[in-house]
Amino acid sequence: MMQDLRLILIVVGAIAIIALLLHGLWTSRKERSSLFRDRPVKRAKKARDETPLDDLDEGVGEVRVKGARPQQSEPSFDSASVDSSSFDNYGSAREDVRSEAKSPFEHMSPVSAYDPLLDEATPVDSPRSQVRGDANPQVVDPRQAFIPESDIDAPREPFAYDAPSSAQQQPVSHSLHEKVQPAPQQPAEPAAAKETVLVLHVVAHQGGVIGGELLLQSLLQAGFQFGEMNIFHRHVNPAGAGPVLFSLANMVKPGSFNVDTMSEFSTPGVSIFMMVPSYGDAGQNFKLMLQSAQRIADDVGGVVQDDERRMMTPQKVESYKARIRDVLKANA
């Protein structure tokens, strides 16, 4: 019961408050509208009282009338009324002022000016006479009097910015493309060869030659046999049986030998070569080839050289062995 009564009181109070607000808004709007209706009437009445009779006849604006009222400077004016003769004087004064404003140069006397080009005084007419004269007068500029005609007729050179450089005409996208370049790719390591040829040279001393008969005896003692392609071969069996381990050829083209004329034959050197991989152990085969080359060099009085025709060194021997290991690893 108490809750229902409280709810009713709240609703009634809210309605009363809303009614008071609406009544206040309606009252204030009514007063404001009446205030705005009265203002234009008061303004028109005040403007009608302040506007003189001369202004009404001539149609001069209100601002100009206020700035030209002479009533305050004349002591004969009465505070209550204004004499009609003052309006006539005021109107005539304004007529004179207007006529003077229309022609401000009529009372100016002509002034003579000295022209440096004509060496005489030239009267300067008033602006009105100049306007009434020729519509297109010729004006001489003293700054152009001493300029040669060649300079006037010569075409002017274009400014630097009239022709932009080619570097500025290039698109931004190109300069960005040039700046951001991909990193150079590292060259890929060459794949290990699956086969190689090891070469040794046995050459005579500088300026010498190796005799054919002496060379043939040394080759036979080292286990070489004359065979295919008219060159000598070293087989697994020194008697000439089994696969070929390495071969020996003449350094002079065509690289072959003629066994029947070996006694009449001479050469600056011979070449021993071995293919890797080969039959058996390639490392042992290379060791046997190196021993055979050293033996032949001792027999004929020559020296052993590598594949670059340089003296054989322990470092070069290790290089040969490394090449053998690489090839065997590639074929594993």
Curated annotation (Swiss-Prot):
It is a single-pass type I membrane protein. GO terms for biological process: division septum assembly; FtsZ-dependent cytokinesis. It holds the Pfam family ZipA_C. Residues 40-189 are annotated as: Disordered. It is found in: Cell inner membrane. The keyword Cell membrane applies. Residues 28-332 are cytoplasmic. Keywords: Cell cycle, Cell division, Cell inner membrane, Cell membrane, Membrane, Transmembrane, Transmembrane helix. Its main location: membrane. InterPro entries: Cell_div_ZipA, ZipA_FtsZ-bd_C, ZipA_FtsZ-bd_C_sf. Residues 76-88 have a biased composition (Low complexity). Residues 40-51, 93-105 have a biased composition (Basic and acidic residues). Interacts with FtsZ via their C-terminal domains. This is Cell division protein ZipA. It comes from Pectobacterium atrosepticum (strain SCRI 1043 / ATCC BAA-672) (Erwinia carotovora subsp. atroseptica). The lineage of its organism: Bacteria, Pseudomonadati, Pseudomonadota, Gammaproteobacteria, Enterobacterales.
